[in-house]
Curated annotation (Swiss-Prot):
Protein's name in the database: Alginate production protein AlgE
Species the sequence originates in: Pseudomonas aeruginosa (strain ATCC 15692 / DSM 22644 / CIP 104116 / JCM 14847 / LMG 12228 / 1C / PRS 101 / PAO1)
Keyword entries, A-Z: Alginate biosynthesis, Cell outer membrane, Membrane, Signal
GO cellular component: cell outer membrane
Biased composition (Polar residues): 102-115, 343-355
Record GO biological process: alginic acid biosynthetic process
Gene designation per UniProt: algE
Signal peptide bounds: 1-32
Amino acid sequence: MNSSRSVNPRPSFAPRALSLAIALLLGAPAFAANSGEAPKNFGLDVKITGESENDRDLGTAPGGTLNDIGIDLRPWAFGQWGDWSAYFMGQAVAATDTIETDTLQSDTDDGNNSRNDGREPDKSYLAAREFWVDYAGLTAYPGEHLRFGRQRLREDSGQWQDTNIEALNWSFETTLLNAHAGVAQRFSEYRTDLDELAPEDKDRTHVFGDISTQWAPHHRIGVRIHHADDSGHLRRPGEEVDNLDKTYTGQLTWLGIEATGDAYNYRSSMPLNYWASATWLTGDRDNLTTTTVDDRRIATGKQSGDVNAFGVDLGLRWNIDEQWKAGVGYARGSGGGKDGEEQFQQTGLESNRSNFTGTRSRVHRFGEAFRGELSNLQAATLFGSWQLREDYDASLVYHKFWRVDDDSDIGTSGINAALQPGEKDIGQELDLVVTKYFKQGLLPASMSQYVDEPSALIRFRGGLFKPGDAYGPGTDSTMHRAFVDFIWRF
């Protein structure tokens, strides 16, 4: 979208991030000067990714097609001094086009149709992925620690948290009791090509906590709470709106209860695994209302109201034998209601990737191609998986998607096409994820708790999406998104 409105350029935050990361690493010994020499742990992760995509617009707009390759280098350093430790991971990406080399940074969010290029990704960039210091001396429990800095917040389902973000996070993990509490806010992407935050991340603070217990061997039950304080500003009536402007603000609180039976443990020996979660979303939300004038979005006001919404996710997996597994899943996020009060949304920190198929490979819960958010969405899932020792695994997943309210929009997704009112059928998808693992044991033992993959692998992950009636006539009959990843950790 073109506009004559001038915008003051913002300086890149990447140099600040690198300076802060170096300060954290160099400052850690001062916290534990009497604890002895730090081990010298450093390395390099090499990732080569090929992406094929056609096309996310379903033929309703030009472009949206990719067939490109890139390399992603991630140098890291880790030091430990008694109860203190520090970690840094950088990133250097070069590609033939703006492809996705990182599952935590979706390439579906860009700065197109914006008044400036502050969020338009480049095909090559430098970044600081993680930089933190950690203290594990608050208690005598080995699974307790306090971490400060840009870090990966993650829980098993990937539906509450799975992202790199600036946070102060306390963790307490034992066999029978797990607990976490923290506060987080995104201040920068720490990339040389992105000077702007995504609009949903601007001026947004997260406060969260959870506690769970193992009430029987391999069976856990727990509760979660997450509060998001979104204090940003919406455009005034008459002002032009672009993709970098916020579309909603408010105070939202998620309250959830969950029960699992080795649901995300690919080594589980139980005959049946399960997961069940229910989440209530409450609070207040102001949604921006707009109209289109001469191909420009113009703010007309805001729609204010309370929020009373819910989401559920259920699943059952049968371990047929040591190699073969099969399962079903169902998820629903409410939608619609007066002034959108029943419109569920996720926390904004989710990836929706997990080991729900029972393999080491993490698969998107709502489709590798569709990549839906649990918002005005229901999804039925069938899957089968296979793994051979620690060397191979494969997952075949089928999804069927519907809207809950056929006159309301869904949340974010990997499809850039408008939905038609009055139609619920979003579509269906078939996913395939296949991985070959090799060269185990290259990483230092001290790093084993910070990585969740073997030292090297080759992986194919792809999805074929067939749109339903909700996308209307005249759209493409199919859309695909596929990746081939080669990863080697030195």
